[in-house]
Design a protein with these regions (language model features):
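Polar, enzyme-active/binding microenvironments
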Residues: 1-167
Length: 167
């Protein structure tokens, strides 16, 4: 993940360290496009970073980059520029959904390009994301009214289904 606001810095967590200390994190390669509030998917050696905002002006970004454990490489852009979106899945089967301005759209990444997926039932910004491209989970976030939501949805690779809300 990134630290600070729209930095290009990457830090990697060392899972062999049993406690969180300064030695648990190591610097990795910088993003090619410095951004904040971007989404991610994948693992430490096969990650995907996409969307977010760039400075100055907090402009929404459609940039997509892949990380190989050492460096980031630019890839084909998201179809929709946005920040405050969620990510799930892997570097070769990623999922991006939601976003600022209370978006419902979902995009699927196949390792080289993004295509449109099924829309969320509840449009939201800053949702949580987990799972895979064919068994994804979207939860929480901000909606116009009320300001926060506990709504949870499950993605099957083509459409979202409402599930039990968060408590």
């Amino acid at each position: 993940g990134t630290t600070g606001s729209a930095t290009g810095a990457t830090e990697e967590f060392n899972t062999t360290t049993s406690t969180i200390t300064g030695a648990a994190w190591a610097s990795g390669g910088n993003l090619n496009t410095a951004r904040g509030i971007l989404a991610g998917a994948g693992t430490q050696t096969a990650a995907l970073g996409f969307g977010g905002y760039t400075l100055p002006g907090n402009s929404a970004s459609n940039a997509t980059e892949e990380y190989n454990g050492t460096s980031w490489s630019n890839q084909n852009n998201l179809g929709t520029s946005r920040r405050n979106l969620a990510g799930a899945g892997t570097q070769t089967a990623g999922l991006g959904f939601g976003g600022h301005a209370y978006r419902a759209n979902t995009e699927e990444y196949d390792g080289s390009s993004w295509t449109a997926g099924g829309d969320l039932n509840t449009a939201r910004k800053s949702p949580g994301g987990a799972g895979t491209q064919t068994a994804g989970l979207g939860f929480g976030g901000y909606t116009p009214s009320p300001p926060t939501t506990g709504a949870t949805e499950e993605y099957n690779g083509s459409s979202w289904t409402s599930s039990n809300s968060m408590n």
